[in-house]
């Protein structure tokens, strides 16, 4: 949704713990981050496949979560874009080099074939819809457990 600024209060009032926004959905990302913080909420910033890390790099110390989209937003069931693994690795490298503390979440086409690669690249949160609800005859618990590397 855009512009995102006018909806932040609605999400905060509805009880959201983390409010994640796209840089493209705001005229001033820093102001939107501060607006989210004014409601005592965690801040997430989402990077589309074609959004570069440098778009948010100077604000990473103010972000709780970076959501790396491994498909273009719009509909479920899309194929994972393997070139996104490099972006995840680069985010992890920046996080470690600058000693920052943010989660790396990946959403889009996550399945049993790519979950390990994504986690090893640096993701600690995976979003998976189609795999969770459709694999193994819809056995949600089994599918979630299978996506974990524990």
Residue ranges with predicted function:
Residues 124-128, 132-134:
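Acidic, Mg2+-coordinating phosphoryl-transfer loop and its flanking beta/alpha structural elements
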Residues 36, 119, 133-150:
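C-terminal helical cap(s) of enzyme catalytic domains, especially alpha/beta-barrels
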Residues 6-7, 16-103:
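Conserved anion-binding
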Residues 72-74, 109-113, 132-133:
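Short Gly/Pro-enriched loop/turn and capping motifs at secondary-structure junctions
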Residues 45, 106, 127-128:
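Hydrophobic residues in well-ordered beta-strands that form the structural core
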Residues 5-13, 51-63, 108-126:
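Catalytic cores of alpha/beta
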Residues 8, 30, 81, 116, ...:
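Conserved strand-to-helix beginnings and helix N-cap segments that scaffold or border functional pockets
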Residues 1:
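N-terminal glycine-rich "phosphate-gripper" loop used for MgATP/nucleotide binding
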């Amino acid at each position: 949704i855009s512009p995102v600024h006018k909806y932040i209060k609605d999400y905060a009032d509805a009880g959201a713990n983390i409010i994640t926004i796209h840089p493209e959905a705001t005229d001033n990302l820093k102001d939107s981050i501060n607006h989210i913080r004014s409601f005592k909420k965690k801040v997430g910033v989402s990077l589309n496949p074609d959004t570069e890390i440098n778009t948010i790099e100077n604000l990473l110390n103010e972000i709780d979560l970076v959501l790396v989209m491994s498909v273009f937003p719009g509909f479920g069931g899309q194929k994972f874009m393997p070139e996104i693994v490099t972006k995840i690795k680069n985010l992890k490298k920046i996080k470690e080099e600058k000693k920052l503390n943010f989660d790396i979440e990946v959403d889009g086409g996550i399945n049993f074939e790519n979950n390990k690669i994504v986690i090893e690249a640096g993701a600690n949160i995976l979003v998976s819809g189609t795999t969770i609800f459709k694999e193994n005859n819809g056995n949600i618990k089994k599918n979630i457990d299978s996506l974990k590397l524990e």
